[in-house]
């Protein structure tokens, strides 16, 4: 599982690095926050367009040497690494923005087939644990891309970008070298069709799977909770709870540690007791954490409720793909994995705007910084609605070996 999930550490580090420190370089070439936001927020556009297409393509091919998912990883990794390495050396806003867009395109070209690789090469009884390991690696990547990279960035700005590029290539090489995809049955490979026929087939296969439809709606809501909180969480700490930026960073670090440990544990528990059952518990804990965030007014209480939120959030963001694996037809794993990734992309585009509008609306009734607590009410509402859609996603199964 370590070798299989290593690429997650690489691309998670890269994404955190780009979204955290590249804006500091862009700021030298433009004073427009809108332009900086466009360069970094463009990720949502690529995550809405590429995953489904590349996921379907990875379902339709087979190579004897590299399988069907790994060719996409091999192709995209050099583009991801090169754009990352060259970005801090670019002479102006436009070249940096282009490098960023190349990175985001390669990132989603890489990650959707890679995600589809996980169920291809692991037994059904281990899917929860694999997702737990992946969550742990994703949390480690966030730590490396935000904390470790910050130390390196202030020594020599290009250094974290160069080292992260090397990590991506090394981790991809190790995974491709050590992980061998099983050859699919010829009858399971979808026929190659034209674009219109392919779109019609995707629509029909999605329409036939009511459980997947409901689950994808629920996943969009879960991803939206995080996407809506992320841009405003520090403002909530500072203006609603009266914390300093340093205390806010400490709280986020506490959430990060909880996220990594709980993600690893929830994967093991899901395989033992059932993914749906553990997910339901996580959703109620997550909902409780969100409602607690609305009510508190003292920063001291944040040290209690944020680990609770991190615990529930880790479960809610770790297990969805492990549950989806059980719902997906084997011949369309790439397609539905792509759609799963698209829900995250749509959430990253829509949720921050909705959260910002909710804060502005709340400002009419709440004052003294309390309007930022509305983000927790919105997140709690989305979790509550998701419980309805999740209920129709199917029955639980515990696969034992």
Language model feature labels by segment:
Residues 20-36, 231-248:
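Short amphipathic helix-loop junctions that connect adjacent transmembrane helices
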Residues 182-217:
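Juxtamembrane intracellular "pre-TM" segments in multi-pass secondary transporters
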Residues 109-122, 315-329:
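Intracellular juxtamembrane helix-capping segments at the cytosolic ends
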Residues 88, 168-179, 377-401:
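Multi-pass alpha-helical transporter architecture, strongest
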Residues 69-85, 277-292:
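Structural signature of the two symmetry-related core transmembrane helices
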Residues 47, 128-153, 341-352:
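Glycine-rich segments within core transmembrane alpha-helices of 12-TM secondary carriers
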């Amino acid at each position: 599982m370590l070798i299989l999930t290593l690429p997650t550490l690489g691309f998670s580090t890269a994404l955190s690095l780009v979204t955290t420190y590249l804006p500091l370089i862009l700021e030298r070439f433009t004073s427009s926050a809108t332009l900086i936001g466009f360069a970094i927020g463009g990720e949502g556009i690529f995550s809405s367009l590429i995953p489904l297409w590349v996921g379907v393509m990875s379902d339709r091919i087979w190579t004897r040497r590299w399988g069907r998912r790994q060719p996409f990883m091999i192709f995209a990794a050099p583009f991801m690494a090169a754009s990352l390495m060259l970005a801090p050396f670019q002479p102006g806003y436009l070249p940096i923005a282009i490098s960023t867009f190349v990175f985001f395109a390669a990132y989603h070209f890489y990650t959707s087939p890679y995600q589809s690789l996980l169920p291809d090469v692991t037994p059904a009884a281990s899917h929860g644990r694999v997702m737990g390991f992946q969550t742990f690696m994703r949390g480690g990547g966030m730590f490396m891309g935000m904390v470790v990279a910050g130390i390196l960035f202030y020594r020599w700005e290009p250094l974290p970008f160069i080292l992260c590029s090397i990590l991506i290539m090394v981790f991809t090489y190790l995974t491709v070298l050590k992980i061998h995809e099983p050859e699919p049955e010829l009858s399971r490979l979808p026929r190659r069709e034209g674009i219109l026929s392919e779109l019609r087939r995707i629509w029909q296969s999605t329409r036939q799977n009511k459980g997947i439809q409901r689950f994808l709606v629920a996943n969009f809501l879960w991803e939206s909770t995080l996407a809506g909180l992320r841009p405003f969480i520090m403002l909530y700490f500072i203006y609603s709870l009266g914390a300093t930026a340093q205390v806010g960073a400490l709280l986020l670090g506490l959430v990060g540690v909880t996220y990594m440990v709980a993600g690893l544990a929830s994967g093991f528990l899901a395989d033992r007791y059932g993914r749906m059952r553990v997910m339901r518990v996580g959703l109620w804990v997550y909902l409780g954490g969100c409602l607690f965030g609305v009510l508190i007014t003292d920063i001291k209480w944040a040290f209690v409720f944020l680990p609770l939120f991190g615990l529930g959030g880790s479960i809610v963001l770790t297990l969805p793909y492990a549950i989806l694996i059980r719902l997906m037809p084997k011949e369309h794993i790439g397609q539905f994995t792509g759609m799963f990734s698209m829900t995250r992309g749509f959430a990253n585009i829509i949720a921050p705007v909705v959260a910002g509008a909710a804060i502005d609306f709340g400002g009419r009734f709440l004052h003294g910084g309390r309007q930022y607590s509305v983000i927790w009410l919105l997140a709690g509402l989305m979790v509550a609605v998701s419980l309805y859609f999740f209920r129709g996603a199917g029955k639980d199964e515990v696969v034992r070996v």
